[in-house]
Amino acid sequence: MTDNHAHLGWYSDGYHSPKEVWQAEQEAGIEEIVVSSTSTCAEKYKLVVREMRELIRLGGTRIHPILWLTPRMFHSNCRWAIPYMIHSKIRWQGVKMHWLAHKEWYHNRKLLHNALELAHWLDVPVLFHTGDFKECKANVFKEVCTKYDHLTFVLAHGRPLNETKDVLANCSNAYLDTAFMPVDHVKELAEAGFAQRILYGTDAPINQLFYEDMSTAEYIKNNISEMRNVLGNDLYHTIMSNQLYK
């Protein structure tokens, strides 16, 4: 079983080490994780590389690293960052952009193009955060998925639901992950014919910000149990076996 949306590093509730994250995922029964570092948002690129190296040391090929891109990485005063991370001997298996955290992606399409060209060069999927704000609603990415139809995109969180459904219906290169999604939304999308394009994800350990009295392992176990109960065996096993990052 793979958690297709996990994190490590600095976040508003403190620091989540590679060991903490990997142990929690394993305790919950997760075998592989697709993971990006929230330390990227503090532009701590060297720390990100150290974190990923340590996580890979712990988990080996069961770790699927995602390169979180920020606009600053493409600015002239910080252009060393991407080459540094690319040549870090980490085999990045996806790139991520968070348009709400970094609104410049929304306003600067040349910058976005450069980031997507990097994804094309790396030959990896692109993960977009989606949410209920104008910069990151799912339909914002419909044009991107259509224009860059040679790339594969993942809409993290699937928000808003109807817009996510519209993107999936019109863009065969679009997937979504279930991180922090209501399970009834997951079921609705699966029953609409998109089960093969739904990736299981948890957003762990960000859950600790919202569920302070529950461990990450317990949160994941509860989420998996709810998925199984609500989806039923067939849809549950289909979604849990989907794998995009390799």
List each language-model region with its residue ranges.
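Active-site neighborhood of phospho(di)ester-bond hydrolases with catalytic His/Asp-centered motifs
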Residues: M1-N4, V34-S37, I66-W68, K96, ...
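Histidine-centered catalytic micro-motifs
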Residues: M1-Y11, L127-G131, A156
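Mid-to-C-terminal alpha-helical segments outside catalytic/metal-binding sites
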Residues: T2-N4, Y15-S36, H120, A195-Q196, ...
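Divalent metal-dependent hydrolysis catalytic cores, especially in the metallo-beta-lactamase
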Residues: N4-H7, D13, K19-E43, R62-T70, ...
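Acidic-and-aromatic substrate-binding clefts and catalytic sites of carbohydrate-active enzymes
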Residues: W10-H16, S39-L47, T70-C78, H102-H107, ...
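Histidine/acidic-residue-rich catalytic or RNA/ligand-binding cores of hydrolases
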Residues: S12-Y15, L47, C136-K142, T164-N170, ...
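Active-site gating/metal-coordination segments in enzymes
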Residues: E31-E32, K46-P125, S172-Y175, L189
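Catalytic pocket-lining loop regions of alpha/beta-barrel enzymes
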Residues: E104-L199
